[in-house]
């Protein structure tokens, strides 16, 4: 139990008659790269939205590092170490890449409130920002505005912003959607490295089964708000219920 | 190179302003003071509008609070202008904190309408509390006491003396706003304008930063109102009227929302245009409207924004 980072207890959410989460119970262990999969409308995005504070659940509890965060606002969850990236690149369009990364860095270093010091002259912040830009391969474009980036680069930046918040647990919503093979390799390599380091525990929502099965140590299958499969990729592949509702359609 | 140019321009501007203070007629002094006071109002306002992306229609309330603050302070407490100005700023900031607390829960049109509603409430309070504010007559005949700093006593009774106090606060405001724009706080505000969801997911409480921007801009409005009162020596409730709230909006739009110097350039154009047009016609609003239309349609990013882009393009060609 010591190794558990996030626990979900009896989590439910319904939009009118549409049940997107029904008595969900699971826990995520530190350092175990987990994927959440499921057919369209299975409740994957809603689950992430609830866990990160975007939507309140109807009932249930979310425990993060032993602390009940069910009612905590988004920004406090992020400061506690729970962050996410978005399906659609969600960046600061008119700000430079440096500034894009600097905002979460300032938040982490608790410098965001200072209003008389210069950001550009803060060596510590610059070093940290450059480190992250280098990690996602965008260091050379640090002065370019984010709106001028290609779609794939914007996705890389998006992941960079999420990493800059120094999360313990990071949800990536379709991290490789719309990327070219080079960018995809880079981002997957980053995820593997960081995960192996043990700094960040990743939870990935993906449609691409190659990514899911090559990367994950654990796969959770959602279907209509229920968990219908949970285990190693092999176990999930072998699960008859999963094959029936989901894998049978896409993976042969 | 680029930043050197900026310092040269600022130094030149300050030199010109000092020159005006020593050598100009009273009329030019008066116009220059009006421009500087409007600049302080608009620069502070633009922290909220251009930087944070929140359009407020209620900032005249804070301007008026600053003005009434000085007037009441010098009538009942102390005539020291610096004490009065501090009281004015503090009162405006405090009012901004209360009003902002409710307004920052919303954005865009809802935010704008809320600020408008609060602004009108402040206006009618000032109109109706006759015993304190003098009702529709306002407060008039406020004298400028001397600025006494220990041994030193500086008289500001004459406009040519008061001018340098205005210039001092104008320069101080420029410095402060510039520092805010370079600071982490300023960057966070820009982040909120660009993408408030992402800012929240960067671990920052967006509402609190919006409120902080609201209070800071309210404090600058209070400073402008305080100086405006000392300049005119009277204030009426119309200082809080919503039509007065439009001034910093127009000024920021004309000069350039996303620029530091936009509100200053906008203020110069605004005050001079008005002065110029009013000599020929009483319907200055009509002609001003036409000119404003031309500036907004013709200069994308305001006068400063479009000029900078032009200079960049030209320097690339050559």
Map each language-model feature to its residues.
Chain A
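Glycine-rich phosphate-binding loops of nucleotide-dependent enzymes
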Residues: 2-252
